[in-house]
Amino acid sequence: GCCRFPCPDSCRSLCC
């Protein structure tokens, strides 16, 4: 699954 919005910097490269 993807990160929540707004997504944290640590997840931004994964799904944002």
From Swiss-Prot:
The record's domain comment reads:
The cysteine framework is III (CC-C-C-CC).
What are the entry keywords? Disulfide bond, Secreted, Toxin
From the record, give the cysteines joined by S-S bonds: C2-C11, C3-C15, C7-C16
Question: Which superkingdom does the taxonomy of this entry point to?
Answer: Eukaryota
Spell out the family assignment given in the record's similarity comment.
Belongs to the conotoxin M superfamily.
Q: In which tissues is it expressed?
A: Expressed by the venom duct.
The UniProt entry lists the main location of this chain as secreted
Q: Name one GO cellular component term.
A: extracellular region
Protein name, entry field: Conotoxin nt3a
